[in-house]
């Protein structure tokens, strides 16, 4: 390099240092006398070494051969290497997150699986299979803290729920189907919430579960509970209702409906003060099992008797707002 050739032409003087000769005294030496001469010769040899300036490499980002003349120095004027920190890139969503989002997006318009086309069903099955193959919790029953809490049903292939979802009772709507797991007391509570123009109510079943394997739990239902209707904040009667394919117009009966609203409101307040109705479930046919094939902090995929699939989202999950 051009700089090296110019550097070699610089004049360098050799410094010759003559160390003072040690004075010998009559005291006995710790070392043999022969070692004194060897030490003196070694010291003289070291004094003949040429002194050259020291250079250190500095890390730079320029294309220039030696970089910019901006060395950072300490108090002794010695240069130091400087490492430039690269700009951090934002983290991209993981593959599992993308699969979960695609799965939740595919539920749109399916009414929890009641109304789903053949193509959409095939897409959902494929996404579920991919998530199950990437399950971050291989032994869900050993991770009870993740299982613990309220899970809201987003999709199912369980035919037993379809009559409930498709009954289309006038003025009654299924608001939420959920499952609450208490891992400390080993209990499961399944709940269906209904809403109407006057009040809301729920039907709940309580069960005990027993861990049978890292993936499987055995469930035994013990009692059912019909919740006391709770009066809604506002009572609204629609102008018309579709019932059994016919549209019923309530407009001519607005006066009568208004008086009925007051009466119904008083009745609802009286009923709301009553305790819920409980009934025992002792039939052995209500025992079941549940296999959890995917589990994380947001989403759970379980399979029940007959291969039915349940996809549930944890209460508070951001996927519930998609």
UniProtKB/Swiss-Prot annotation:
Induction: Up-regulated by gibberellins within 20 minutes after treatment and down-regulated by abscisic acid and ethylene. It is found in: Plastid, Chromoplast. Expressed in corollas. Not detected in fruits, stems, leaves, and roots. The keyword Membrane does not apply. PANTHER family: PLASTID-LIPID-ASSOCIATED PROTEIN 4, CHLOROPLASTIC-RELATED. Belongs to the PAP/fibrillin family. This is Chromoplast-specific carotenoid-associated protein, chromoplastic. The gene is CHRC.
